[in-house]
Amino acid sequence: MTVLSTNALAGKVVLVSGGTQGVGAAAARTAARCGAEAVVVTGRRPEVAEGLVDELDALGTEPLFVRADVAVVEQAVASVTETISAFGRVDCVVNAAALTDRGTLLDTTPEMFDAHVATNLRGPFFIMQAAVRDMLRREAGGTIVNVISISAYTGSAILAPYAASKGGLASLTRNAAHAHRGDRIRVNGLNIGWTATEGEDVTQRRFHGAQDGWLEEAGRDLPAGRLGDPGEIADMIVYLLSDGSGVVTGSVIDWDQTVMGGQG
């Protein structure tokens, strides 16, 4: 289900990096439901993408899976060039791929730091670069949404490299929006909070020893009584991609159950 119009993205070619699971997959489904002409999803594992591609096809869009690790610049750029090769253009981009391994200021290795920057910042940078070049070439404008994180503000102590990389992506979002505000290219971002995704389940079990039922237990301590839902985030992503969001650009919207600066 989506609260958006079924033609919100009519005729648009949408590229979703990290689009085979979690928030990325939800955004791909919502884009298809909202009339996108084509939805391209990227990921590292074709077997994970198979079912999603079938879903997208059933929703009436033309789906395409591009195998790509956004941490590798050549593969990140290739996801854009393959989209253009298949459909002639890229109108909308969602950068949803992310790495969330744990590391503090004291125990993060150079390799871990570089891995976070490569996936969470460098990959989106060069995807945006390639997409914006196509948009400028066609003088057609376009929209980009970067899936950032509430950790871009501070983050917990065990998320030092993650917070640093996401803080960089928030700044990049505003910088790109400012640079191309005169080209009808809008760039926005979402600082998403704790969300119930497949990846979060793996993270909780791998790093925190979580057991079955952890999701419900964690939700009881939150204002809404639950974690965020990927489908809700997808609605906001597609809204920001669509003409319905008007002239909005350079906005990084907090999508969380906490209020920055709130006390007591």
Feature-to-residue mapping (PLM):
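Residue(s) in the substrate-gating loop at a strand-loop-helix junction
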Residues: 149
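Short, small/polar-rich loop/turn modules that mediate ligand/substrate recognition or access, typified
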Residues: 94, 181, 186, 248-250
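Active-site helix of classical SDR
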Residues: 128, 165, 173
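Conserved glycine-rich cofactor-binding loop
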Residues: 20-21
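Short C-terminal tail/terminal secondary-structure segment
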Residues: 2-5, 154, 238, 249-264
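Alpha-helical segment proximal to the catalytic Tyr-Lys
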Residues: 133, 178-182, 246
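Substrate-binding pocket helix/loop in short-chain dehydrogenase/reductase
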Residues: 104-105, 112-117, 218
